[in-house]
Amino acid sequence: MAAELRMILYEDDSVQVQYVDGSTLQLSPCGSEFLFEKSPPVSAHPLEQPERIRQRTHFVISTYREQLQRALDFRNSSATCPFLSETIIPSERKKHIFIDITEVRWPSLDTDGTMIYMESGIVKITSLDGHAYLCLPRSQHEFTVHFLCKVSQKSDSSAVLSETNNKAPKDKLVEKTGKICIRGNLPGQRLKNKENEFHCQIMKSKETLKKMSCVNGTEGREELPSPGTKHTCVYTWVKQCWSVAACPEEWKYPLSLALHFHNKISNMSKIDAHITQSRFLTSDISEERGKVVSVLPRALSLSCPVPHLHRWNFCDSLLQRQSDEYSYPELVKMVWYKGVTYRLTHQNMNSIEIYSGDGSVFKSEGAYFGNYFTYYSIQEGSGKREEKTYSVNNLPPDRPGSPFTVGSLIKQATRILQHCVKMRLSLSHNYRICCWKMVPGINDSNILPLVLKESLIPSVGRFLAYSDDKVHAIFLDGITLTLNWNFSSPIEKRQVNQGLNLGWCKLTFPDGQEQLIQIEHPEPYERYVTTVTSWCRRLTQTSPREMPTHSSSSVLQENWSVASELEKIQKFNLLLENSGILNQISNKKNEQQSFDHYKPGSSETLLGEVNENRVSIALKKTSEILHDIDCLLSNSKK
C-alpha cells in the first residue's frame, strides 16, 4: 500500500489525498462517499483514462479500508463536524456508553480543578465528567482537544435514549478531580503554595501516573459492557488540532483556562513567563467565564441528503507529483506535505502557519499577504524561546544537513496563500454550496450573493458590489478588476484602505489572462486600482440608509422591481376598467361600425369624441397612484 505524499483539507471539509505511486483518494465534504483513482501503468496510453472506484464510505471494501481510515482521521482532525462510520473504526477505539453525551462541563476559572501540568510543559484541562480534555503545549501556537462523539447514524434514525433509563454510574476517577497535578519537578526551586490556591501533588512513581487521569489513560475510562446489553450508544474518541489564533467557539473557554493556568505555573516557577499567544485570548478570559458548558460537535449522518453536490477533481496527478506546483480546486484549510503541516485561517485576512514537525512554527506576518514569516522555536533542555523573521523576497540559503529547508517551506506556503487569494477573488461561488450545510427547502437565492450596488460610470465602465464583500469592475477597454472590500466596517474607524479584506486584487485581461496585483504597489495598473477603490470609499461614505446591508430580507429588497412593475400594470388596468372609458370606447366603436356602412372614413375621429375631461382625470389618478407606489417601495427598501 502506497504512502501518502500530500493530504489536503478544503474549506468545505472535503479531502484529497495524493500517494507516492500517483494514485489519489477524494472524500466528499460530508465524508459519506469517496472516489479512488488508481495510477495508470507505465505502458498506458497518455489518453487512457485511469481506473476509478467510487463507493459509499460506510460500505468500503477491505482493499481501501486502511487508506480511507487515515483520510477520515485527517479530515476529522480539523473538520467542523466529524464523520464516524462504525464499520471503519477499529473495535479497540469504540466505547459503548449508556448515556447520550451532547455537552461537557468544564471547571470554573476561580477554582483551578482537573488541571495537570506535565513534565514536557503540556497543560491538560479535563472536563468534570471526563468526556473531553484539552492539551496545550509549551509553545502555545496550537492545541489538541479530545472528546467523545457518537458514531454517525442513519439519516432516518429516531432512536433517542430517554434520560430515565440512561443513568450510568459515575466514574471513580471523575470523582477524584479538583486537583492540580504537576508531573516531575519544575526547573529551579519547588513550587510554594503561597496563596493557598494550588493543591499540588508531585507524582514520581510510574505506577501512580498510570492510575491518574492522564493523556494515555483518559481514553480508557469507559468500560465495555457485555455484548447483550441493550440501549447502548457507540462512541469513539475524536482528536482535533486547532490553531490558538483561530479557536472554535466551543473550545474557547477551556483554552482560556489552559492559558491562564500556564501563566500561573510559569510565574510561580520563575521560568519563561512570556506567553507568546496569550494575547489572543487573555482579554477574552473574563468574557468566557460563564461559558463553562461546551456543546460537543455532532457526527454527520451516514448518508448524504444531496449527493449530487459532490464534486470530484480529475487532474493529471503524474505531472503534479513530479513538481511542487499543485493545483488546488477549492479554498484550502489545511495541507500536509512530506511531514510538514500548513494550517490556514480565512477570518479577516489570509494567514498561514507552518508546523515543520520538530516543534517549531512559522507564522505569516505583514499586511494582508504574508510578506514576512516569523520563526518560533523552544529549546528542549533550557526551554529558551527563539524567534526569527524571514522576508519572502530575501530567503536564506539552504543549510546542508538541516531537517527542513526554510526557503522551500516559505515558498510552498506563499504559493498556497496565492491560491487562496485567487479563490477569494473568484466570482465562482461554488465553494459556498456545501452538501452537509444544505437544509431541505432552503432558497437558492440565499446561497448566491446579491448585488448591493451597481453603477455605470460614463467613459469608465460598470461597477458592481456584492453581498459577500466582492467588488467587480468592468472597464470599457475590456479589463476587469475584482477585489474584496468590507462595507460593514465603521466609517469613523476606517483608514484610507481599511475596507480591504485582501491586500491584492485580480486583473483579467481581454485575452483571458489573469494577474494578481498588490494594491499598495499597483504599477502599471494604478489607474484601474485607484478608480475602483475610490468608488468603494464613496459607497461606504454614503448615508446609513444607503449603506449596503446583509440583512436576511435583502433578497426581497433586491427583487422588488419585477413585482412592482406587475403591480403597476394591474393597478392601471383596474383603473381603466372602473373608469368606464373602455365601455364608452367600445360603445362608440359599435355605433361607428354600424354608421360606417353609410359614412366611411369617420373612424379616425372616434377617439376624439371621448370626453377629454374623463381621460385627464383617469391619467392624473394613475400618475398619483404610481407615485405613491414608488415612494412606498423606496421607503421600504431603505
Swiss-Prot record:
Pfam families: C5orf34-like_N, C5orf34_2nd, C5orf34_C, Polo_box_4. It comes from Homo sapiens. It comes from the Eukaryota. This is Uncharacterized protein C5orf34. The lineage of its organism: Eukaryota, Metazoa, Chordata, Craniata, Vertebrata.
